[in-house]
């Protein structure tokens, strides 16, 4: 389950029936503005992904391994858990909710998978 990622800031679908490399369709930015495949966007990710872990940048996005370092514009000395902890301390309480910015299609494939994975993860 370490190899499951989702993206905030965009609205997209994951079509499990499409071939490798064509499964993701980005519908728009989360605010409804147009997403352009030709534009460059700043993306935040954890150090594992940012350093090429899981090959999402190399195999997935086609970025050569030797280019990854030059694309990093900021690197924190602290991990994301630290920043989550500080934000929770600042707010006192948090009420997390799903972004609901993506979904699997078609539903007839996704729903059985969700049921199966919940049983594996939570024993239900």
At which residue positions do the language-model features occur?
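Catalytic centers of hydrolytic enzymes
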Residues: 1-124
């Amino acid at each position: 389950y370490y190899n499951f990622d989702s993206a905030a800031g965009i609205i997209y679908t994951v079509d499990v029936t499409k071939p490798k490399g064509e499964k993701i369709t980005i519908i728009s930015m989360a605010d409804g503005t147009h997403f352009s495949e030709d534009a460059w966007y700043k993306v935040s990710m954890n150090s594992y992904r940012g350093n090429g872990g899981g090959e999402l940048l190399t195999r997935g996005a086609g970025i050569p391994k030797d280019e990854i370092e030059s694309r990093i514009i900021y690197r924190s000395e602290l991990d994301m858990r630290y920043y989550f902890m500080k934000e929770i301390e600042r707010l006192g309480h948090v009420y997390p909710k799903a972004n609901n910015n993506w979904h699997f299609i078609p539903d007839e494939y996704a729903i059985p998978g969700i049921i199966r994975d919940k049983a594996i993860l939570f024993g239900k």
